[in-house]
Amino acid sequence: MSDNDSDVQDFSSEEEDHGLLIDRKKQQTLDFAQDGSDSEGGSDLDDDDIAEEESPIQNETKAATGEEPATADGDNIAPQSADELRPEERADQLKQERLRRLKKLKASKKSNHKTGVVYLSKIPPYMKPAKMRQILSRFGDLDRLFLKREDEHSHRQRVKGGGNKKVMFREGWAEFIRKKDAKLCAETLNGNIIGGKKGNFYHDDVMNVKYLSGFKWADLTEQIARENDVRQSKLQLEISQANKLNAEFIRNVEKSKMLNNIRAKKHKDEDSSERTESHLPVKQRKVTSNRASAPESQKQPASEKLSNVLHNLF
């Protein structure tokens, strides 16, 4: 009996040593996972993955010592130490960090709906977008700025009349990151001079600024695209009408040329026929008559030779 007890004790001691080695290996694996897992995939180690690394020898050791092996359902789970709770804490931290990133992403998406857009109905002459951005940036962070140039026809007329050749802008839109900055800009600049240093070229120019409530930059892009489409359709319509007028004019010109050629040919044929008729030799014979009742112009005068002969005879 003592021999059997000694065998059991020796067996349990060997298995306990082997179990300690496995625990150390498991602890090293956990430490390595904690130190080197920066990504989300490396931090997903949990108790189920660690439990798969346990060998059947541990279960036999627990059976020899009278301990029940832990089942997959977790009905009989031995109390874990503080070192074994670190992966769970790490997982909780990663989950919190992930939630924080998601909240930040949602906040950045919602920030697009909190931007403010102002409308500039009048731009100071020859002011460039860089200068306008510098002026508007005094009221807050400016995101996007769009200034609409004058049309080419007015630019040519101005240059032709002796004006400046620089580019002028008629109107513009500016988008602020924060809505309150856009409202502050509209309330401050509307109807007031730009100010600044007295030697500034735009010191005395008056600004017309209006805050567009409920208006977003996407609405502006859609409006500009719609205006471009309408302008393009009008241009195509005008071009088609001009082409029709040109085709009709060319057809009328060709028709008039054809009619003129027909008339000219007809007159030419008539003239040629008249000329041929006038050049024919016509010999008109003189009408004579011996009748007593005939007029004197038609009577044939007596021959002089015959009268001479008769005169000599008598």
Swiss-Prot record:
Domain RRM: 116-206
GO MF term set: ATPase activator activity; RNA binding
Biased composition (Basic and acidic residues): 18-28, 83-95, 267-280
Biased composition (Acidic residues): 1-17, 37-55
Cited InterPro entries: ABT1/Esf2 (IPR039119), ABT1/ESF2_RRM (IPR034353), Nucleotide-bd_a/b_plait_sf (IPR012677), RBD_domain_sf (IPR035979)
Signal peptide range: none
Location of this chain's protein in the cell: Nucleus, Nucleolus
Keywords linked to the UniProt accession: Nucleus, Ribosome biogenesis, RNA-binding, rRNA processing
Residue stretches of biased makeup (Polar residues): 289-314
Task of the protein: Involved in the small subunit (SSU) processome assembly and function, and in the 18S rRNA synthesis. Required for the early cleavages at sites A0, A1 and A2.
Protein family according to the UniProt entry: Belongs to the ESF2/ABP1 family.
Protein name as annotated: Pre-rRNA-processing protein ESF2
Species assigned in the record: Eremothecium gossypii (strain ATCC 10895 / CBS 109.51 / FGSC 9923 / NRRL Y-1056)
Primary gene name: ESF2
